């Protein structure tokens, strides 16, 4: 009761992720919380945060049922970004259906690009679509680095995905935070919630499914 009586702010981070059935449930929870707070005499201010929502005011309004003022002027310092599209090359001598040429898999190319960036001194985060792909890309990048004579770099490449034990996940996050890891192949588990600083490059092996996810991953 004391908390509700003195409630001043409710902060909802990454509000663009609350959509569909999940978003409807969050919306109901927020509205119920506001009604209970009002019953205790509190009128908390709602703060919604998102770096990728196409219509931030509309999204926030749908979640809370109130009129929302959008603050869209970005004053955060950001460096210049370059977005490049990479098409995998053809596998020499390989033929597909009806003799069609076959391209290298996206994961193979992603690992090659990742290792090249690491050799150039760029801390790199590589997003893939599955847990298995995260393990595969990290392993292939390590192999490329060893072949290039940088086994020391290979030891500083890892994969990150859901399903790890909590202590293993925290250990990887600490290595990311302190700069010990130079390269990480990950699923969308690193797309949200964890601050990854000091990155130089992001590789996406395929379109992540939504424009919001693309912006979120590219902005890491």
Short names for language-model regions:
Residues 1-220:
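Helicase motor core with emphasis on the C-terminal RecA-like subdomain
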């Amino acid at each position: 009761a004391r908390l509700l009586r003195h409630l001043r702010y409710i902060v909802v981070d990454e509000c663009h992720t609350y959509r569909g059935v999940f978003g409807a449930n969050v919306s109901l929870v927020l509205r119920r919380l506001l009604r209970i707070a009002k019953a205790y005499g509190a009128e908390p201010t709602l703060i919604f945060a998102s770096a990728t929502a196409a219509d931030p005011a509309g999204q926030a309004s749908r979640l809370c049922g109130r009129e929302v003022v959008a603050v869209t002027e970005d004053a955060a310092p950001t460096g210049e970004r370059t977005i490049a599209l990479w098409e995998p090359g053809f596998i020499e001598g390989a033929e597909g259906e009806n003799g069609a040429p076959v391209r290298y898999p996206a994961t193979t190319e992603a690992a090659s690009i990742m290792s090249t960036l690491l050799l150039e001194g760029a801390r790199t985060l590589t997003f893939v679509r599955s847990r298995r792909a995260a393990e595969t890309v990290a392993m292939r990048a390590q192999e490329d680095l060893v072949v290039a004579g940088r086994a020391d770099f290979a030891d500083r490449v890892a994969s990150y995905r859901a399903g790890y034990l909590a202590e293993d996940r925290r250990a990887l996050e600490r290595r990311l935070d302190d700069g010990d890891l130079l390269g990480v192949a990950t699923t969308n588990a690193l797309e949200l919630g964890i601050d990854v600083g000091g990155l130089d490059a992001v590789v996406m092996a395929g379109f992540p499914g939504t424009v919001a996810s693309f912006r979120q991953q590219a902005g890491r």
